[in-house]
Amino acid sequence: MSENAQKATEFKNQGNAAFSSKDYNSAVKCFDQAIELDPSNHILYSNRSASLLALDKNEDALTDAKKAIELKPDWSKGYLRETNALYKLGRFEEAEKSAEAGLKIDPTNQQLEDALEDAQYATTGAKDPASAMANLFSAQNLTKLRFNPKTAPFFQQPDFVAIMDQISKNPSLFSQYIADQRFSTCLGVLLGVDINQGPGAPPQSQQPTPQQPTPTPQQPTPTPQQPKPTEAPKKPEAPPMTESQKERDLGNKAYAKKEFEQAIVHYDKAVELDSSDILAMNNKAAVLIEQQKLDEAIETCKKALEKAQEIRADYRVKSKVYTRLGNIYLKKNQLDDAYKAYSSAVLEDKNADTTANMKKIEKLKKQRDDEAYLSVDQSIIEKNKGVEHFKKGEFPEAIKCFEEAIRRNPKDHTIYSNRSAAYSKLLEYKLAIKDADKCIELEPTFIKGYIRKGTALFAMREYQQALEVYDQGLRIEANNPELLDLSRKTVAALTKLQSTLTDEERLQQAAKDPEIQKILSDPIMNQILKDMSENPAAAQDHLKNPLIMAKFQKLVNAGIVKLG
């Protein structure tokens, strides 16, 4: 390691210590100095981003997060920093995209999953405040409030219970009660902020100063004697460390300096002095992991657990050892053993960390099991069984076979096409469309996918959408006879339907289509339609633009614009 890199590491460690002490300004200065010495170290920018975010310097935090991603695009923590900064800036949709990008790199990262959930929730709230409030005052959150020490007393007050009941039924009423300190306290608890403690608010312990009575000349008010300040009770001193704890502490310091052999010496000494020092054994296992001595680390954890069982150690300590054991098994790709260890950790102490580990291992086990289940040959066998059932009109049985075929080979687009056809036979048109979409996604040039989707839409009397799907297929294979025939039938059905509708009914039906809504709400398109109605010669100029032509044709097909 170069001299500059060594100095940068020292400044980084100082910055980390300052951050842990919540001295964020000092942390930023340390990371500044470290970056000057080692400007290509992505971790330094990530750490400075976290410090800047804690100081509410959100734009600067975002800049550092982007730099970390630039230097190390395959590092998920860079995306976590970016997501957090974007979230604090109120750019929720961008935060959502950043979290998704990070999860592509590290699909089991619980922090990114939580950040994505927060961003999605905030995005929903930004678009639909009433929906966000409905989520905020859900039954689950009301239960939290009933058991929170700050808010539990409010639920003993009938008027407050009535308020919360009204807001639960109609979240849009929340603004009427925001001035109620009880309600704002509840809101603060749910949002994780102290709403009643604004920038200019007095401390909660401070009481309003009573107005002094005006003294009269005859009877001057005596000056009250100032009470003597009472001394704050002294905190009890921590008990002195045992010799074993001192050795363990020395081991921790050596570990922090990456002096692993020295750390093991101290941890062994700690256990020699106190055979019940489970934490020293657990810490030794951490050192062995760093040294890639995984089997030895497993044995150390098992000995620690045996001792913990013998002395009936604290459940939190046992949970830590089980977690470390699970981490080792995960490194060795022994997922079943890791699952058992993590399960035991949850049983001992169910908290955010142990729960996150369980989710991670369950996801990994499912991925492994799904991959082990893959078989192209077996998929073909199940697919052929499904085709035979389909020919006999046994559509539920056909679907079961196609489902099994997909499990065996989820990348075969033809199976989704077959299942789509079976769903259509059972009048499950939405499921048929979903399978057709998947088929098109996997193989965009497969014409059957467009035929399946268009047929389902036709059956739902969604003629306009069916025409668009057939048109997509014809762009790939312009002379496909089946697509051409289906398009003609759909045009005929659409014409017949529109001829029986009044103008008002036609508009109502067209308004259900989101694309038509968008076209009709476009001020530029409205102006173009006005120009075309007032000056038909202008139509030719406008329709030279392919985008305008496509929108215009959609309005014609929907019967909103009539020609001739």
UniProtKB/Swiss-Prot annotation:
Its main location: cytoplasm. Keywords: Cytoplasm, Nucleus, Repeat, TPR repeat. GO terms for molecular function: Hsp70 protein binding; Hsp90 protein binding. One of its GO terms (biological process) is protein folding. Residues 139-177, 513-552 form the STI1 domain. Residues 197-209 have a biased composition (Low complexity). SUPFAM superfamilies: TPR-like. This is Protein STIP1 homolog.
